[in-house]
Amino acid sequence: MSKLDELLRELCPNGVEYKKLGEIATVLRGASPRPIKKYITNDSDGVNWIKIGDVPVGSKYITQSEEKITKEGAEKSRYVRKGDFILSNSMSFGRPYILAIDGCIHDGWLSISNFKDVFLSDYLYYLLSSSAIQQEMKKRASFGGAVQNLNADIVKALVLPVPPIEVQSEIVRILDNFTKLTAELTAELAARKTQYSFYREKLLDKTEMKALMVEIADLGKWSGGKTPSMAEKKYWESGTIPWVSSKDVKQPILSDTIDHITNAAVDEASMTVYPAGSVAIVTRSGILRHTFPVTYIPFETTVNQDIKILVTKEGISSRYVSHALQAYGESIRRTTKKQGGTVDSLDFQKVLAYKIPVPPLDVQNRVVNVLDNFEKICSDLNIGLPAEIEARQKQYEYYRDKLLSFKEHKNELSD
């Protein structure tokens, strides 16, 4: 018998009590001082202004904020403390994060606090991340088939298992071991990707390739996109035509889009369908605060207004351009990013004027062959480290959901 089995048998032989989260914790919605620009400050005594863009990909903790607000702004916002939980009520819907800093949250967040007499922080994190709770939040927040913003009442109504602290601690120990293994593999993969970036930059060195420096504008035809009316169901329901938005551009090669539109949208909303083999970049999104997203699209697609898409001209390999834009991406982002504005964006005219090395087509193809093979090793979920990480993650999710499922203890009323 495992230690967990022993603890369950000893401490809760008749099952585990379930309680509504609102009965054992404080759940509140964030608040935004408006207009927010008035309260943003660079002063050292400013209060952390926590946004979704401050969250590292895959992170459990929020450790810093890019912006601060004045104390006056903080009085009009929701103050949260180190150790509290926050949940996104829109982007990264329902995803829990543990605060490692004090600060303020806007109305796109919910906070959970005053739970430590009942829950270990790490146990509550695993519990809120579990498939059952995530599905329950999505179900409760859905109305008429459209996902609504997650609100405090929905989160308060979540019914959660409350085992003894000793049981929570053992579950955390087991799941921490799973996540530690995954983290080690992920770190090794990150090191390989760093190595890949180094070799990519060496291969794309203009001197090594005897390449000409060519303005991005001269690589082919650049175009933008738009969004068909969301109010027209016929533009979206059962759509089969890919529609690229910034949330799709996360991998070097796009496998599919989250949203799809219909032929009616193409015809009536004058959407342009771009050919397979196009290259897309994001020019307007919060992700531009730290990343320049580029992707190669191996299928016909449409795009929204935050995307610019390139159809390369004869003599230019679109795969080569994709690799080159990724290699020079940080420099492009830094030199073309607009200052100010409510949403991060690039000055596209400056992007078009940026120069990248373009060698003869046969050299482009040789470079692509080398980089495609290296990229496959780094990102293909069917081989090597990516496959092992994927398998570990599935194993972790399986045991997490299994360990967090308890027989419910129901108090019997005596006659």
Which stretches of residues belong to each language-model region?
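Amphipathic alpha-helical segments
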Residues: M1, G15-K19, L124, K156-K193, ...
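A short glycine-rich beta-alpha junction/loop motif
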Residues: N89, C104-L110, F143-P163, T301-K308, ...
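Non-catalytic DNA-recognition/assembly elements of restriction-modification systems
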Residues: L8-S32, K202, K206-T227, E388, ...
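Short, solvent-exposed loop/turn positions at domain surfaces
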Residues: E10, G73-A74, G144, M230, ...
